[in-house]
């Protein structure tokens, strides 16, 4: 690992790293020797994929490009304590679209820290990395190491890196050549059993009364069609999350909020269903009784077929100024996506999603998309989508609002719409220029997606400049200016917006960013607002190997979106999160979200509250942990605590036992008399799921 590519630019690596490679018919073996002062090593034993905030740990990434075309690059990583992380990357226009952390691969790591640094050993089954179906294999491969030196983060790599080529994963120059490796079909069974017991107080002052336990069992089956393609079937799957979502402040949001997908089933091959539009959002498959998935790959294409029967069907209606949400009953789901990969610079495809509701109603969506790269620095990306909908006749949504002379209320209306996206990007080492056009009709609806906003024609023009300096106290800086022009489909003016971003990276692995966002004009619910501007400061810092900090401060003018008569208020919001490592095993993560919108021309506030959260984890080893999460929501006077003991030796095998203890004002007690720390609802749960290779 000879080259430093950040902050240096293909300069000699400041620390030595040696890599040793071997393979058998079933596994690839890597040994990595990372030289450093052991007192400078950062990190601790942690759960899989929970990388420290701001990458505050010493870590080694192995990158594999089995098809040599950047369609799917697999990053398998380990920190100095043997704790794993795995990521799937693809050719894309931004880091947010490029990296998919939901990918899970089964591999083993062991590590040791010694007087001249640390070593990590990887044992990776061939079956964990989809690859061309041939006995003689040639894969793209390189190694990246990250460490902190003199207070600043440093990346070194086994390949040189051209900063004028924004496709980092297209620049994997190393080759793994492995001959006479036969394909060995892998079949996996994944049975589970689970039980949960819930109860609540029948009346104030009474003890919690528990009902009967709910016991579930199910099984998943995965069959390797070949070394790149699989078929999966899951019957009565348990798609529940064992860790509560971190509550977002939505008191002044006119649209539904999106939460990340945390369920392991939605990993293999699911990167094919990531779209600019949000046409597919896996959390809309809420409670399936059965689901199947087939992923197919060959030299020039990739495909996925996903089907499910959902017992509880979320229903989201996007709108011009706000969205509407309800929950329906049983629905039948199909999704198909095919992508043609010509080379690392050209890929295009088509897709369809279909949802049919029991009792009537359906949503069908069809689209084509593509990404083309020219002369390394130019990219053109497009998505053109058409939807055809028949509303169910149901009471899932209660609203008298209308769109395109149709009612939001679900009354069996038929309609169709479209969503078109076109993006042009030019990116070099220092400059980035973006033109992005979106055209979303008022009748557009994605029944398997997350599209809370429609009825808009939206043009974004952005120009940015970034410079890496490599100085101790100023690692780099960036400047970006972005303008937005938005009209509705009828041509009525909706917004005229300007964003200015300034950022620096400095000592202590600290990134400081300032954003000024001003709406020169904004129309909301037929009311015009002018010169509504606010500032945001964001600071992410790793000043020591034990401490990581994140602070976001927002102040300025904002619209009170959820008032019957919206008006301008004075906003002040703060988010603070700290991650502190105690020794090699204990991690403490408190956070606080505060938000207030004060009335300007009269006394009082539109809202004022906070959400406080504390997450503490003791990691006995890389597989076993005890975690306690507690959160108090001042906006809704709710408190919960969630203890969880978890054993997770690989992405699929898991045993956990835990509970949720909640308070909520279910007896309509006066807010002054309500005790938010008195538990009114209680749940205990246990689950065992074990991966069996056949």
Please name every model-derived segment.
Residues 1-339, 360:
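Structural preference for beta-rich elements and adjacent junctions enriched in aromatics
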Residues 2-3, 33-37, 193-198, 308, ...:
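Generic short beta-strand segments
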Residues 127-129, 355-356, 466-468, 631:
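Short beta-turn/strand-loop junction motif enriched in small, turn-promoting residues
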Residues 182, 188-213, 263, 316-332, ...:
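Primarily recognizes Gram-negative and organellar outer-membrane beta-barrels
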Residues 184, 296-299, 339-346, 470-475, ...:
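Glycine-rich phosphate/diphosphate-binding loops that line cofactor/substrate pockets in enzymes
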Residues 287-289, 302, 363, 371-374, ...:
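Exposed, low-structure sequence patches enriched in small/polar residues
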Residues 304-306, 348-353, 381:
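Hydrophobic core segments of beta-strands in well-ordered, beta-rich domains
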Residues 367:
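Active-site-proximal loop/helix segments of hydrolase catalytic cores
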